[in-house]
A protein has these predicted regions:
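An acidic, gly/pro-interrupted, aromatic-rich
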Residues: 1-129, 178-208
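C-terminal structured "cap/appendage" subdomains that terminate the fold
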Residues: 120-193
């Protein structure tokens, strides 16, 4: 079955090496699309405006996320997290295009893919070994020969794209608060960010 919303986010952060495992403390406010709270808040409300946290507050376990019942965290709600307005004994599990939109475009997921890519590049000098690292970190298994061939082809196509679009590469690796490794060329890091995102979007990663 597909993991619950909180488990999905935490798994992506853990694979990226971003998850803050500290226990306890006040609620935190991770990334959220701008303007959502303003649409539903009363003018005098003390939760009229959403201001994301900085630093480790962006990467704590989802259980610590500040929860406004009138406007639950958008990315978690997309994966069927409840509003908490009423008791829920069992969550539904929907399957919608918005869910892929989140895992491929939400800043939390894009940043996780980039940090996972940085780990892969630092861990291995060759494309094959980087793919093996990504597979073991996300799927907990080695890749088969056909999978390696397919992913190598994908990486080459992405690399060719970013070789001629430096602006797009630079824009991609800037997503998220954590800075990109300045020692890595933006085009190469962007290439492996896309490949890492492919791993994070596999059913094998999202379902346990």
């Amino acid at each position: 079955f597909r993991m619950d919303a909180e488990m999905l986010r935490d798994s992506a952060l853990a694979a990226a090496g971003l998850l803050v495992e500290k226990i306890g403390g006040p609620p935190v406010k991770p990334y959220q699309p701008p303007g959502i709270w303003e649409e539903v808040a009363m003018p005098e409300s003390n939760t009229k405006t959403y201001v994301p946290d900085k630093g480790e507050g962006l990467y704590r376990r989802s259980v610590y996320t500040f929860w406004k019942r009138a406007s639950p965290p958008a990315s978690l709600e997309t994966f069927d997290a409840t509003s908490r307005e009423v008791v829920c004994s069992r969550r539904t599990r929907s399957n919608t295009p918005l869910q892929a939109f989140v895992t491929m475009n939400d800043p939390q997921w894009v940043e996780a893919a980039r940090r996972l890519a940085e780990r892969a590049v630092a861990a291995a000098p060759t494309s094959e070994r980087r793919l093996d690292f990504l597979a073991r970190e996300t799927l907990a298994r080695p890749l088969q020969a056909a999978e390696i061939k397919s992913l190598l082809g994908s990486a080459e196509r992405v690399r060719a794209k970013y070789a001629f679009d430096a602006e797009a590469a630079a824009s991609l690796v800037k997503v998220g608060e954590s800075p990109a490794d300045p020692a890595l060329p933006a085009a190469e890091l962007a290439t492996w960010t896309v490949v890492a995102s492919q791993f994070l979007n596999l059913d094998e990663f999202l379902n346990k």
